[in-house]
Amino acid sequence: MDCIDKLGLSQTTLARIAERVGISQGNVVFHLHSKKALLAQTLRHLNDEYRCNWIAALAAAPPDAHSQLRALIEASFTPKICNRRKISVWFAFWGESRSRPTYMRVCGDNDKAFSDQVLALCQTIEARSTARLKAETAALSLEGMIDGLWQNFLLGSSGFKRAQAIKAVFELMDSIYPDRKPESVATI
């Protein structure tokens, strides 16, 4: 991941990985087989880590939809997921996904699962409370804000904090569902 973060996908080579790790290129080729296989494996690792993170957050959250949605938001900004290095690598893969079916499939499957979960929670909340937006629009808005804050975390000022991001998304959520009382804001 370090090479992708520092050099991007196109400049990441098995030779550069070997140099960075301090082993022979032959050893890297033996274990990784090809750059294509390495990149696919890296993306699957990131994808699995992210998916396991948000699924675990749901499992640990109280069962009501509002708490579960807040848990998904917090999970999107945990340090092991939301850090400059990993976001940089995610953006590199997202940028290539349109021309690489493997990347599109891996990214797309997880994105769809996350989106479906956010939408289902928004639909449940909408059915039980006053909502200023339809569930589809609310889900799209919350996800778009998370993605935008990830981009801000990567490209914005170095003073940007996870707690600020979580608070911002919670405030959007609270403005969409005004009759829900906000719980305490996480301090990640």
PLM features per residue range, with description:
Residues 44-50:
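Short, basic, alpha-helical segments at the C-terminal edge of helix-turn-helix-like DNA-binding modules
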Residues 32, 78, 92-99:
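Short helix-capping/turn signature of helix-turn-helix
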Residues 112-124, 145, 151-188:
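C-terminal peripheral helix-coil segments that are non-catalytic and often amphipathic
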Residues 2-41:
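Helix-turn-helix
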Residues 41, 55-86, 135-142, 184:
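Hydrophobic alpha-helical connector segments
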Residues 61, 94-98, 153-157:
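Secondary-structure edge/capping motif, primarily at the C-terminal ends of alpha-helices
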Residues 10-11, 127-135:
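Short, charged helix-capping/linker segments at alpha-helix termini
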Residues 52, 82-91, 101-126, 137, ...:
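Amphipathic alpha-helical packing segments from all-alpha helical-bundle domains
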